[in-house]
Curated annotation (Swiss-Prot):
This is Tyrosine--tRNA ligase. The lineage of its organism: Bacteria, Pseudomonadati, Thermodesulfobacteriota, Desulfobacteria, Desulfobacterales. The gene is tyrS. ATP binds at residue 233. It comes from Desulfatibacillum aliphaticivorans. Its EC number is 6.1.1.1. Pfam families: SYY_C-terminal, tRNA-synt_1b. A motif ('HIGH' region) lies at residues 41-50. CDD domains: S4, TyrRS_core. The keyword ATP-binding applies. Belongs to the class-I aminoacyl-tRNA synthetase family. TyrS type 1 subfamily.
Amino acid sequence: MKMNVLQTLKERGFIEQTTHDQELEDLLSGEQVSCYIGFDPTASSLHVGSLVPIMSLAHMQRAGHRPIALVGGGTGLVGDPSGKTEMRKLLTLEDVNNNAEGIRAQLARFIDFDKGAVQENNANWLVGLKYIEFLRDFGRHFSVNRMIKAESYRMRLESEEGLSFIEFNYMLLQAYDFLHLFNEYGCQLQMGGSDQWGNIVAGIDLIRRAKGGSAYGITFPLITTSAGIKMGKTHKGAVWLDPERTSPYEYFQFWVNTHDDDVPRFLALFTFLPMEQINKVKDLDGAELNLAKTILAFEATTLAHGRDQAVGALEAAYNMFGAREIPADLLADSSIPREGAAKAEDSVPTTVMEQARLQEGVPAFELFDEIGLCASRGAARRLLGQGGGYVNNERIDSFDYKISLVDMKDNEIILRAGKKNYHRLVLSEK
């Protein structure tokens, strides 16, 4: 018997709370259901923290339902106070539209808009709203007493910053979005982060009061690592889905560096691999668990950037850190290349250097020439000037940059010239 998509989402760790749980399960067991999630266009790119809602829409589509990805081009002009301790900077319409374009392109990598999925921008119906008519027709359905009890408002009302009137309107606008999509697409389900519970319930109530219709909500848990760090954050900031902000290789390495305790959970959330295979990963450790991390990285990078980029990132990792043969029975449904993986270079060329020399620092152009990454110091200068020199996969942006002990990570420094020429520096034992 095919599993209901609600059961799938629960099993894989997507769900924190639902409204009318049994009714919702019955609804999703029947005919096609239209469901939506809103995406806030405060930046031109989504990041890894947005993957839970994106993947949930993809699961809905795979189960035969119709996902609606709503870019908040209209609500983005107001700003959502949910989960914020101070008022967001208001964006211009031009900023919001530009950001919305970038977000739509990224969503298309996960959701097939040629097979029934819908992309919408709420600016299409919110920007032209007439204020008096909106208050008369819909404002009467909202209780201020109930609104200020919502967690999203209560936290702001208790803060020193307070809650602006423009933000107070946000709940009404999001509720109206749900009503509009209910009218236009028969949309009965809204999903969102745990901080959206009050806004989702407001939309459900508006549909019931204004149309006498039934609607439902699902919220997702806040995903943190086992160390308690918010998902998608690193010491360098957010991990973006835009390859211009976070390269496919950096994206791949983000997943490779997953903490051991998080691997099964992240495989369930961020890949489509079967749970019966993922559950076996819980018993792995050491080298076998590291191979599971490689598969997680490959699958996640394939979804975000395509298979070619994932293969390129995998090969770069093999060339840099050494190849590992991946057993056929480890997460067997993964599309990761298994044959030939062990034929990659065992390691990159390595130079042993004395600590005292790196303590002082060596000019990058000098070192690139010395270890053979460039044919001469002049060639090395040209390479650096063109942005083709890297230390630990970070572009060297200055002619004067010196390679030093500060660059040492895990007892080594990885230098790169261009896309594929790597060299490792390690310290002598003296």
